Amino acid sequence: GRGKAGGASRWWLHHSLAALREKLGGLVLLRGETRAMLREAVAATGADAIVWNRCYEPYAVELGRGVVTDMQALGVAARSFNAALINEPWEVKTLAGKPYTVFTPYLRAARQRGVATPVPAPSLKVCSPPKLGLSLDDLGLAPKKPDWAAGW
């Protein structure tokens, strides 16, 4: 994303990536321009599809479109998903087809839509990660001071 993450955010990210690496049995970590790194990862792994959680900031939407274009050129399926919202920003509209600008009418309309039933998690085929990328420590995410874990 844009901007620099603070110490607490970097500490959290370091430990979240470590837990994910443990759960998956490996994790490829890359640093660089996102689209170039994804092309490199696809080439190294032979992936036939990539998926990611959708972000809604304008720069992230533009990045997602670029990734789709890159992957289509490589013959790789690319798809983003809603990961954290009950409703996508474009799903709840006024009767005139415009976004709501006042919360209470939005809330009423959103409640009428209901909440989709969660789908079960897919089964994943886990493979050994390729010899590609950086170690978690190479990313330099875990600051030494202050100790963000003290008292937890």
PLM regions with names:
Residues K98-W152:
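Glycine/tryptophan-enriched, flexible segments
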